[in-house]
Curated annotation (Swiss-Prot):
Stated name of the protein: Chitinase ChiA
Gene Ontology MF terms: carbohydrate binding; chitin binding; chitinase activity; endochitinase activity
Region (GH18N): 26-446
Residue ranges of the region described as CTD: 1473-1578
Length: 1578
């Protein structure tokens, strides 16, 4: 897969010209892997136009001191990196997750360099021992190089070692509930870091190598070696020797650890002795840190990049004094159970008591959605908002340190942060010091929403600004007059030190903000080029149009061409490099010479002359660097033969078809011309396979093989008839000639938030054909327009040009276009001799089929039948070419059998002359169509109307008639909510006025306009709207109460527990002053929460109905009452549908999928699935603990709005048929992590609400990816007591134990983990491998079913020690299923998984090949494995033998992904479920056994064997169909009885063996009956 992926990337990577920074500085942005979770900041949201480099952070390392050679990179979150599919990542993408998004980001911004950052604060502890070991650092560097081969869009690696020698973690910090290991040190860390970088450079000579250096002003000269300090440590090389650039932390100078307010990132020292960062000789600041790196360590300025923070620090408990909160005591919190004092709560801090960061990000300060809000700044001005100011917040700017801060003396809080002002000053500082650029930590911290990327935009703007008093130098690099692309330009000072570097993609360069009055020199660097430096003296004004000239040497390839010893003239020798081709022709002496081969390029040299071959066939010179001599020898004359012919579509020539003759090592090709002819000249004696190809077409013959070609051949092809499955397709012609390359535009309207307005272009092929894939119109119901725009088609007009506002066709429909105005499409065209409309009364009928039948007229005009299909407006037409040459029409009609058995009138249009002028022939379902009124309500049209009390609303309707005859309008009645209104008429425009009373506001109203015609026909239209009051006279609007929870007011409880009651109360013209609840004899105040919610926790005391009265009072004493009833009921044994004895379980999709179409649960009634899992419950914003049911909203609409009751009814329809419906939590996108008891309780209560509301029969645990990491790799006691030390593990177990206990034993609990997390534990136990085994072990009594997914994640070792992967098919199923029943020791942990009873185990397989990435078995292969496991009966190819204890006759059945895939075309119309159903049905053999009395009318049917023939008789009805299956579900006989008799005798070779058959008999009345029949051969 990885090799395929790399090839795919290299082939598809587009050469795009996209936006990139215009300045010459580097802008390095760190992106945190975890940003996809709470932050919801996925990679596609990164603005690559403002960055030059992106550091993806972080990767860790695996290091074993005993085996340093195994040191490798370590992915820290496989779900984030490679598994998630957020943002529409294709399910079949070769890599998913952030790495897919990084690839797409690179495609969007080709200039952007993407690096993997290794280490970080919590995952760099092993960098010290790795760097100290020559073997380990070489192994790590080699793994990095391999990583880039696999993912070629990665440009290098960044080492974030925090920190060499000193600093970093101390082992007391807690992250995600676990202590972070302490940083490891070696006295030689500083030297070993250089050696690690050297190993990386050697392994990746052409890739980027960088580091992130620390911020400790007093220590960095010891921690990092550069040109100025390396000698004192005995080094002749340093970090800058091997790094492309060096970033350094420009933040975390000050923080809460000082228990005193200070700055996170001061640009300059404060000079204040009270500042914790102050030092008499050396303070902590960016300026002093930069001086250390430049002057003490000696890093070149053009390699040094300064860090820029997008975050700051918060301090609480700030002591009051006169410094506005600055440099005063701010002690942290002392929290029981925490080793360290705790910081204030930061932007994204979770509920962990000992995990507070105090970190405040700019996105938080400007009010963007975060976990813990500190919204004090206006996002436009970045000044304090009025509400924050009124709460006591004040912004200060320290002009000494050049940073802002916020202080609230009332709350005693202080926040150090960065804004646009401080960011600009930091960037100006970078420019003034001639540093290489700025580094950002971290991109997801920037502002979002309506004003995104404020700080990143400021960085870009500031780098592009000109510093007053400076000069710039700009120009280009050229070779002659041509620009030299992809060239490096260096700017040096008078001391010849490089001060700035630019890599120019197009050859142009610019250096800005240079000190005036200095001497500068410029030169360029590029392999194989020689450049002349340019020197500029005393530069006091801007220098433009500076040209650096370069030259590139050229070389010659020469030699002779001989036939034996005889010179050969006239031979063309060609040297090719990319698009460059150089040639020479040999002279009479056989000599040739090709000059001008550019140095450094790769050239392929060949010789050619018609009828001859030459040796060598080709010679490649890679990176040519000298003159070359190459001689050729001419071979024997080559005789060529032709393969030629024509390609026709019926009798029409087909142009543009590529005919290819393939042979070992290559191919020859020709393209058919306008006459459809082609000709291939092929060397004799070869073996060729000849095929024809044209996009979207197939041809007969598919291929023809010529072996040892020794004569000319004629080979004609016929284009096959291809029936388009596209709903919208057609042809574009100029008269009768197809138009290739025409652009057809389809415009679709905004439909919902996921189906926006869009325009899609289809381009015609060589045959003038176009089509739109059905995915283009999926989710849309209407087409705004379908046309060819003249401005896109050479100013040529195509007709029709009025295809607009029609419904998306349900079936494939052809829309043709032509340059002639008489061109015909699915719309009627008046110029056609025969056209018309088809209607049902006055309603157009789309998709109706109109047949014209023409008689035999002469030898060129035979009898023919042609169909026209109506468009969305019911229009049809026949092109005049259809009737050309005919004088008579046999019939024109709509056949009932082609139109759903509907009769259309007239039905007697027959034997009439072909009209000579365009004539309309209309059809209707009604024999006589009465003229009817037509009502249109024209005003108002808004769904909400706001007026003042005393104002009137004027209703307006237009009333006409459907046809012009003697019929008139006799009356028009306006009624509002059933009450008539006075009406006025003016020329068919009717009006009525209504002045609402005070009590009619804040309500919904419906206007009905009914018109009656003189013939008694009527038409009515309605208009619904809500009325609100707006103005001085408005009465008080009462509060509105909405019931939230419990959503299902029947609450099932085994014991009395709290029932949370929640409502929403809002007041449109004021505020809600209070909400009360009266229940169980008492009245209580409800607790106000966010978003106008009010809650009350009610604990029942009896199983009964509890009336509930909720009253909301507004600020004007207006009261609204809401009544409801909560029923507390026991969990009865019949609340949940029990599992069947033999199970076929399928997952049902809650989304659309073109390959596996959506199915309603009602459609599953009667299918072979007897248990169905609803997919899926996920968690809100992937928080890991707040369940939310995914729903296919567009499938359950009422008046265009999702109606959950329709979904409930749909689920109920399947449950009513006796099939349990279980809801599955997780899936590929369902992220579940329960870090603490609070999250566990939210999770359990959320699942209860979903289960109760939708009446699910149980819950299925389908955790995948990151949800399977329980941080329990160190577990060594699998018991319940043992898992208690691992919160994630214990909380999951407790959650499902609580659900089972709450609902009782009838509640179904199932699980469907992947093999990695179950059988993977046999050989390896880590945080993920085998991670689900403790869950199964501790839920073994609660679990009803376990179905380990034997697909996608690959195979594992079986109990016999052999590896069983998907290639071993049936043997993999038997081996891995045997494991979960038998049990096994868990790796080398000393723990044991005890296995589950076979009655709780399902085998789990994909329904068809497309349903999973791997693991598909045919029904026969799967049933072979199941039959062996259940009975011990062997199968062909079996290599695995069950362990003692098998077989397992109680093995419960099959789970499959999914019901939808099984029902799809991929699933061959439910082949899998039918086969397993037949297998289970076959397990109780009987000579003749009725399985299923499908219809009472078929009780006279008998099936039995006589003389090895199957006899089927029915005394009452003729037999229509007999189908016979074997026990594997394979169809042996499908006999359609055309004799209309009551007895059928069938013969089949399979009947001659003693076995059991399933016979399904269908009679003429459609009744079915199925039998098990055994041929006992007697």
């Amino acid at each position: 897969m990885k090799h395929y992926y790399r090839l795919l990337f290299l082939l598809l990577f587009p050469l795009l010209a996209s936006a990139q920074p215009a300045h010459g500085k580097k802008v390095v942005g760190y992106y945190a892997q975890w940003s996809i979770y709470a932050r919801d900041f996925n990679v596609p949201k990164i603005d690559g136009s403002k960055l030059t480099h992106l550091n993806y952070s972080f990767y860790g390392t695996t290091y074993d001191p005993a085996h340093p050679e195994n040191t490798k990179l370590k992915c820290l979150d496989t779900y984030a990196d490679f598994e998630h599919m957020e943002g529409g990542i294709p399910w079949d993408a070769p890599v998913k997750g952030n790495f897919y998004d990084l690839m797409k980001l690179k495609q969007k911004y080709p200039h952007l360099k993407i690096l993997i950052s290794v280490g970080g604060w919590t995952k760099g502890q092993d960098l010290s021992p790795i760097a100290a070991s020559p073997v380990a650092r070489a192994a790590l560097a080699a793994d990095m190089a391999n990583f880039i081969v696999t993912y070629p869009f990665i440009d290098g690696f960044d080492i974030d070692w925090e920190y060499p020698l000193s600093g970093g973690t101390d082992g007391t910090e807690i992250v995600n509930g676990m202590p972070v290991p302490p940083q490891k040190y070696s006295p030689d860390d500083n030297k070993n870091l250089v050696l690690l970088l050297k190993a990386m450079r050697q392994a990746m000579p052409n890739k980027l190598v960088t580091i992130a250096a620390g911020n400790n002003v007093r220590n960095v000269s010891k921690q990092y070696l550069g040109p100025n300090n390396r000698a004192q440590y005995g080094m002749t090389e340093d970090i800058s020797t091997y790094c492309d650039y060096i970033t350094y932390f420009g933040y975390d100078f000050g923080g809460n650890w000082y228990d005193k307010t200070c700055y996170n990132a001061p640009l300059y020292a404060s000079g204040n002795p009270n500042d914790p960062l102050y030092g008499a000789t050396q303070s902590e600041s960016l300026d002093e840190l930069t001086n250390q790196y430049l002057n003490v360590i000696g890093f070149p300025a053009n390699k040094l990049i300064m860090g820029l923070p997008f975050y700051g620090k918060k301090f609480d408990n700030v002591a009051a004094n006169s410094t506005n909160g600055l440099f005063v005591a701010a002690p942290r919190y002392i929290v029981p159970g925490c080793t360290n004092p705790q910081n204030p709560t930061g932007t994204w801090d979770g509920s962990g008591a000992c995990e507070k960061s105090g970190s405040i990000e700019i996105c938080d300060l400007v009010g963007n959605p975060v976990t813990n809000s500190h919204a004090y700044l206006d996002p436009n001005t970045m000044m304090v908002t009025p509400s924050a100011a009124s709460a006591g917040w004040v912004r200060y700017f320290d002009n000494t340190t050049k940073v802002p801060y916020l202080y609230n003396s009332t709350l005693k809080q202080f926040i150090s942060y960065e804004d646009k002002q401080s960011m600009d000053l930091k960037v100006q500082y970078i420019k003034s010091r001639n540093l290489a650029g700025g580094m950002i930590w971290e991109l997801s911290q920037d502002t979002r929403g309506s004003i995104p990327n404020s700080l990143l935009n400021q960085v870009d703007t500031s780098f592009g600004s000109v510093v007053p008093g400076t000069v710039s130098i700009s120009g280009s690099v050229k070779n002659g007059s041509a620009l030299v692309t992809d060239v490096t330009v260096e700017l040096r000072n008078a001391s010849n030190a490089v001060i700035q570097t630019v890599v120019s993609a197009n050859g142009n360069f610019a250096f800005n903000n240079l000190t005036s009055g200095q001497n500068y020199s410029l030169t360029a660097l590029k392999a194989t080029y020689t450049f002349t430096p340019v020197t500029l003296v005393n530069v006091t004004v801007n220098q433009t149009a500076v040209v650096i000239n370069g030259t590139q040497p050229t070389y010659t390839v020469s030699g002779t061409v001989l036939d034996g010893s005889t010179p050969v003239s006239g031979v063309t020798v060609t040297a090719v490099s990319g698009s460059t081709t150089l040639t020479a022709v040999s002279n009479a002496s056989g000599v040739y010479s090709i000059a001008g081969l550019t140095a450094g390029l790769n050239f392929t040299v060949t010789a050619a002359k018609s009828g001859f071959s030459y040796a060598p066939a080709s010679t490649v010179y890679n990176a040519i660097d000298s003159n070359k001599t190459l001689n050729f020898t001419q071979g024997a004359p080559v005789v060529n033969y032709t393969v030629s012919g024509t390609v026709l579509n019926s009798t029409t020539p087909v142009s543009g078809v590529t005919v290819t003759a393939s042979f070992t090592g290559g191919s020859y090709a020709a393209v058919t011309n306008a006459s459809g002819t082609y000709s291939l000249s092929l060397p004799s004696g070869g073996n060729y396979t000849v095929t024809a190809a044209l996009t979207g077409q197939t041809f007969t013959p598919a291929s023809t093989v010529y072996s040892n070609l020794n004569a000319n051949k004629t080979l004609n092809f016929t284009q096959d008839v291809v029936v388009s499955t596209s709903k919208i397709s057609g042809t574009v012609k100029n008269g009768t000639n197809p138009v290739a390359g025409a652009k057809v535009e389809l415009v679709l309207p905004w439909t919902d938030n996921t189906h926006n307005w869009k325009s899609v272009i289809a381009t015609t092929d060589a045959q003038g054909k176009y089509s739109f894939d059905n995915s283009v119109v999926d989710g849309y119901t209407q087409v705004l327009s379908l046309k060819l725009n003249s401005w896109q088609n050479g100013e040529v007009a195509y007709y029709p040009n009025n295809l607009a506002n029609f419904a998306v066709p349900a079936n494939p429909t052809v829309y043709n276009f032509n340059t002639s105005s008489t061109a015909k499409s699915a719309l009627a065209a008046a110029a056609n001799l025969i056209s018309g409309t088809v209607k049902n009364g006055t309603t157009p009928v789309a998709g109706a089929k109109v047949e014209i039948v023409l008689p035999w007229t002469d030898n060129t005009h035979n009898w023919k039948s042609v169909l026209a299909t109506t468009d969305a407006s019911g229009n049809y037409s026949f092109d005049n070419s259809v009737v050309a040459g005919y004088t008579q029409i046999l019939s024109l009609k709509l056949n009932g059998w082609e139109n759903g058995d509907v009769t259309y009138y007239p039905n007697n249009l027959a034997n009439f002359a072909v009209p000579t002028t365009p004539t309309i022939y209309n059809f209707n379902r009604q024999a006589v169509v009465a003229t009817k009124p037509v009502v249109t309500i024209t005003a108002p049209t808004a769904s909400a109307i706001a007026i003042n009390l005393g104002s009137a609303i004027n209703f307006v309707a237009s009333v006409g008639l459907s046809a012009v005859d003697a019929t008139t309008i006799s009356s028009v009645v306006f009624s509002l909510d059933g009450q008539s209104l006075s009406t006025a008429n003016s020329s068919g425009t009717y009006t009525a006025a209504w002045t609402p009373a005070a009590n009619q506001f804040s309500l919904s109203h419906t206007l009905t306009v009914t018109a009656t015609a003189s013939n008694g026909t009527t038409d009515s239209k309605t208009y619904s709207f809500t009325l609100t009051c707006s103005g001085a006279n408005c009465p008080n609007a009462l509060p509105v109460i909405t019931w939230n929870s419990p959503s299902n007011t029947t609450v099932y409880q085994n014991t009395f527990q709290v029932v949370p009651i929640s409502v929403t109360a809002v007041d449109s013209d004021g505020t809600v002053s209070g909400v009360t609840i009266t229940i169980n004899g008492g009245t209580f105040n409800m607790t106000a929460g966010t978003n106008n919610t009010y809650t009350y926790n009610f604990t029942p005391s009896a199983y009964q109905d509890y009336p509930v009265v909720i009253k909301a009072t507004d600020n004007k004493s207006g009261v609204t009452t809401l009544n409801n009833t909560i029923k507390i009921a026991t969990v009865s044994t019949n609340r949940f549908i029990p599992l069947p004895s033999k199970i076929i379980l399928g997952y049902a999709h809650s989304w659309e999928n073109a390959g596996a179409p959506f199915l309603y649960f009602s459609q599953m009634v009667g299918s072979k699935f007897n248990v169905v899992d609803y997919s899926f419950v996920e968690t809100v914003n992937r928080d890991g603990y707040t369940p939310i049911l995914t729903t296919n909203d567009t499938r359950y609409l009422t008046n265009g709005v999702f109606n959950k009751q329709l979904l409930k009814n749909d689920i109920k329809s399947l449950r009513d048929s006796g099939v349990p419906v279980i809801v599955s939590i997780g899936g590929q996108n369902g992220h579940v992590v329960l870090d603490n008891v609070t999250q566990k309780n939210i999770f359990v209560n959320g699942l209860k609400a979903i289960i109760d509301e939708y009446q699910f029969d149980g819950v299925d645990i389908d955790f995948e990816g990151g949800s399977m990491n329980f941080n329990a790799g160190g577990l060594r006691d699998i018991s319940y007591a043992g898992i208690s030390a691992y919160p994630r593990l214990k909380n999951v177990v407790d959650a499902f134990k609580e659900l089972k206990a709450y609902y009782g034993p009838g509640f179904l609990l199932t699980a469907a983990p992947e093999t990695q997390y179950v059988q993977g534990g046999y050989t390896t136990y880590t945080d993920t491998f085998g991670s689900f085994l403790p869950i199964i072990q501790n839920l073994r009594n609660e679990l009803d079913l376990l179905a380990v997914q034997l697909y996608n994640t690959g195979g594992e070792n079986g109990l016999d020690g052999q590896y069983y992967g998907t290639a071993k098919k049936s043997n993999m199923v038997t081996a891995l299923t045997d494991m979960v029943i038998k049990g096994y020791n868990i790796a080398s942990t000393g723990m044991r998984f005890d296995g589950l009873p076979a009655s709780k185990v399902l085998i789990a397989l994909p329904a068809c090949p497309s349903a999973a990435g791997s693991g598909y078995l045919t029904p026969t292969e799967g049933i072979n494995a199941m039959h062996y496991l259940r009975t011990g009966t062997t199968f062909s190819g079996r290599t695995y033998t069950m362990q003692p204890g098998g077989p397992y006759p109680s093995l419960r059945g099959l789970m499959t992904w999914s019901v939808n895939w099984d029902a799809s075309s991929c699933g061959n119309s439910s082949e899998l479920s039918k086969a397993y159903a037949a297998y289970f049905a076959s397990q109780t053999a009987a000579k003749t056994l009725v399985l299923d009395d499908i219809s009472a009318k078929s009780n006279a049917t008998i099936a039995y064997f006589k003389n090895n023939a199957l006899s089927v008789t029915n005394e009452n009805e003729d037999i229509a169909q007999v189908d016979v299956f074997n026990v594997l579900g394979q169809n042996l006989v499908s006999h359609r009885n055309v004799q209309n008799n009551k007895e059928v005798l069938l013969h089949n070779q399979s009947f001659s063996s003693k076995q059991l058959f399933l016979v399904v008999v269908t009679d003429k009345a459609g009744n079915k009956k199925s039998f098990k029949v055994m041929n006992f051969l007697n």
